[in-house]
Every structure is written in C-alpha cells, then in structure tokens.
Amino acid sequence: AGVSSVSERWDPDKKCLIDLLWDLWKTDDPDSPRPHVVHRLDKDTTGVILFARHGEAQAALRQQFMDRTPQKTYHTLVEGLPEPPRGDLTCHVEEHPGKPGTMRICRQGKECESAFDLQKAYDHHSWVEVRPKTGRTHQVRLTMAQLGSPCCSDPVYGSGSPLLLSTYKRSYNPGRGEEERPVASRLGLQPSKIVCRH
C-alpha cells in the first residue's frame, strides 16, 4: 500500500512497484530485463498483482484481460451491510471531470460489472468477496459504494474513517489523556486471487 504500480505522470522519479521488483530481480541477475505491466492496482490497495518478465508474456496476459478471461477475486471490509447481500451489479462509469483520478457513475460511461457475496456480517461492518468481470478504475470501490457499503477507510467513495476498537468493544478505554489509535486506517480492500493462463 502507498506505492504506485507504475510511474506516476506527475512524479516520474518516484519509485514504483515495477522499480522495486526490478531492483529485486537485479540482485539475482544484474542483466535482468525490466518487468512489464499487465494490470494495475490502486495505490492504497495491497494484494495480488501480475507483472510479466518479457514483452511476449505481457502481450499474452494483457490479451486475456482484454478478453475478460482471468478470474479476479477481491476481499473487502466494508461499512455496514450491503443490500442485497449477494448478486451481480452492472453500472456505467467514467472519470470524474471535477476530480481527476476518481470515477463516477454515468449512464454514458463504460460498463462496469461485478459479482459480490457477503462472507460475514459484523455489527458495523461486513466482509465481502467481490469478483470483477470488467477492469475499470476503482471498480470494487465503486461497486461497494453503489450498494451503500463503501470500503472501510475509503476517503474517496466512503467516509474515510479509520476502524477503531471502541466501535466494536464499547468498554474499551484508551487511557486517560491518550488518543485512540486506529486498528486499521488504510483502505480495506485486497485482491486475493487471479486465475489466468500462463
């Protein structure tokens, strides 16, 4: 989390995930080629991501993503309880013209389709499995926000509030004069599985 998958346009000198992976590869083989991007993750997301060792593999993997054949599974901790608790959601999205780098629902936008399934409900939050069928920017985050249960700690599509122990354990007291520290303050979203041909 906190590292871009690829170089950022506005800060091309900042280390990205490709640079870090390449540095690692070069410790074993100084002549190792630079990794190739197959897909991207949001900067605040941690989990499974694919890179290719050479251009031929990149082209083959990217074609699979264009054909929508990889099976992607995400798990997310969300605010509240999604309604309905399972199903498919199809909407249309576009980049938000007033907020660069974010998306919004728009009838004329690109199709965004996801399947979702409630795994566990808690008092104030839920654990949900999401299987995106398309590959839109912020797709899982938008899907959950559309269902009325944005991803925890999502500052763009949700409240952005961190998870506090006092939310779950009413008797919790951080101590006199101490401020309660969050149990989790980063985006509650993780890609957990990608199934593809390789």
Sequence positions of predicted segments:
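RNA pseudouridine synthases
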Residues: 1-198
